[in-house]
């Protein structure tokens, strides 16, 4: 499949950083049994991957801004374009040698996401989307699942880390959703949860207190697969609020109906 020059830039950068992370994953697995543990090693792997992505993306598109999880915001001469990057989404999974992690690259133009990529180096799954051109997994066109009965749906969520977020609210939300769906899952990588919604593997996903790099790429991939993405209020911008719901039109509306009142 032929890609645009922009997508080719993103794919090339992601694959190079992905090779580094895959090598590092092997070392992480070895460190599981050591007294020192892999935490410091994973921190360095995360930073190394971000620098590789920054180098490749800015070399290809000089002047673009860059927002990364590790390095923060780096201003560019071109104020209208900004890369939004998570070099290692699912860090805790990676830390434990669980192959559910991803590189996430989104490109924003004047406040609108125009391209997104999510890449899992562990299994080589590559999700891409460009505004108006559809979403793809390994060159296969994606569509969100079409289920319209919540009782048949599998929904994913995120959980707040220790010392962060509202744990009581999280438990309440999970209880309310679990009572209505076929299954509730927590995989630990927001970008991949969104990619799974885009591919129809999951019917919906919600999470609070996300950062822009967690969901920038996933947002456009879900939308280009025919899904709806919003904040938990239903009409707000998740990149600004940090709270996100996505799914097909029916599932999205049902999740908003259930979750919106709980956060009041």
Question: What is the meaning of each model-derived region?
Answer:
Residues 1-88, 228, 250, 257-260, ...:
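N-terminal subdomain of lithium-sensitive/metallo-dependent phosphomonoesterases centered on the IMPase/IPPase/PAP
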Residues 21, 46, 57, 91, ...:
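Residue-level signal for inorganic ion chemistry
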Residues 47, 51, 70, 87-90, ...:
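Generic detector of well-ordered alpha-helical packing
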Residues 77-136:
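DPxDG-like acidic metal-binding loop motif
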